[in-house]
Amino acid sequence: MALLKKINTQVNRIMKNSSLVQNICFDRVPLFIPRLSLTVKYCLAVKLLIYLLYCWYIYSEVPSASSKFRSFTFGCVVVYHNKFFPRFIRTHSINSIRTFSKFQVIILFSIEKVTRSESKNHSYSKTDISDLHQGYNNPPSRFISR
């Protein structure tokens, strides 16, 4: 975990020095947009990997956490980076995905929720992992109790 924190700090430092990153609303600019420099693309990819590793750490090292909470946490980590996904992924509605597994439903529900809440304030400067857990402690039971 200490190594992940060091890498995250270095990535944040590089991204802070990029004026382009500060002026982009990532909800509308996927990772593959050519305006982003190669360095910034690598930084964003590394940050995504860091969050996924952090979540894997929670999943494997905290046996007392329920599987529902761990799955939901992983969904939130993936969803936190939904700004890098193609637009069509974010526009799927929950009602049209009945054939998906519970885990995918949770992820897509989170994508809808995060996209709605983040589109109001457009503040993407906070990258602390604790931001991922705000508002997700009580997931709707209809999506995970089946």
UniProtKB/Swiss-Prot annotation:
Keyword Membrane attributed: yes
Subcellular location: Cytoplasm; Nucleus membrane
Entry's transmembrane regions: 38-60
Keyword Cytoplasm attached: yes
Cellular component GO terms held in the UniProt record: cytoplasm; endomembrane system; nuclear membrane
Family to which this protein belongs: Belongs to the UPF0742 family.
Topological type in the membrane: Single-pass membrane protein
Keywords: Cytoplasm, Membrane, Nucleus, Transmembrane, Transmembrane helix
Pfam families: Pombe_5TM (PF09437)
InterPro entries (UniProt xref): 5TM-prot_SCHPO
Provenance organism: Schizosaccharomyces pombe (strain 972 / ATCC 24843) (Fission yeast)
Protein name per Swiss-Prot or TrEMBL: UPF0742 protein SPAC977.02
